[in-house]
């Protein structure tokens, strides 16, 4: 059963400018593994913008309650390329309250825009 659906878009250039203006913003929005590639290189702005859009979409799928921490949701990618969500703390508590048992995530970025769709399934 679908419990919630969220969608969000982020303008990549604008998101990158926000990260440049406020260097500590990346540490508030992302956990360490989201910021770097497996090789140790820093992840590109388009990829980070898509991950941010996924977190916004996740909040919407959960009914957009206040009090969710960005660091309590992690977007990671399987070897196959399939994006996944790992939730903890405030996000996991809200998901449990709603009866969420799994997530479906889709990320994309093209033409200067990053987008994400998150489906919460119970």
Swiss-Prot record:
Keywords: Cytoplasm, Fatty acid biosynthesis, Fatty acid metabolism, Lipid biosynthesis, Lipid metabolism, Magnesium, Metal-binding, Transferase. The keyword Magnesium applies. GO terms for biological process: fatty acid biosynthetic process. GO terms for molecular function: holo-[acyl-carrier-protein] synthase activity; magnesium ion binding. GO terms for cellular component: cytoplasm. Its EC number is 2.7.8.7. Its cofactor is Mg(2+). It is found in: Cytoplasm. It comes from the Bacteria. Mg(2+) binds at residues 8, 56. Pfam families: ACPS. Its main location: cytoplasm. It catalyses: apo-[ACP] + CoA = holo-[ACP] + adenosine 3',5'-bisphosphate + H(+). InterPro entries: 4-PPantetheinyl_Trfase_dom, 4-PPantetheinyl_Trfase_dom_sf, ACPS, Ppantetheine-prot_Trfase_dom. Signal peptide: none annotated. The keyword Magnesium applies. Belongs to the P-Pant transferase superfamily. AcpS family. Transfers the 4'-phosphopantetheine moiety from coenzyme A to a Ser of acyl-carrier-protein. This is Holo-[acyl-carrier-protein] synthase. The lineage of its organism: Bacteria, Bacillati, Actinomycetota, Actinomycetes, Kitasatosporales.
């Amino acid at each position: 059963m679908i419990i919630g659906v969220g969608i969000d878009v982020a303008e990549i250039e604008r998101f990158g400018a926000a990260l440049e203006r406020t260097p500590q913003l990346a540490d508030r929005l992302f956990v360490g593994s989201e910021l770097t590639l497996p090789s140790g290189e820093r992840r590109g702005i388009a990829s980070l913008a898509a991950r941010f859009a996924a977190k916004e979409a996740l909040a919407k799928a959960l009914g957009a309650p206040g009090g969710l921490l960005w660091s309590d949701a992690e977007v990671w990618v399987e070897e196959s390329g399939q994006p996944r969500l790992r939730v903890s703390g405030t996000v996991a508590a809200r998901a449990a309250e709603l009866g969420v048992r799994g997530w479906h995530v889709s990320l994309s970025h093209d033409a200067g825009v990053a987008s994400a769709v998150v489906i919460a399934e119970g």
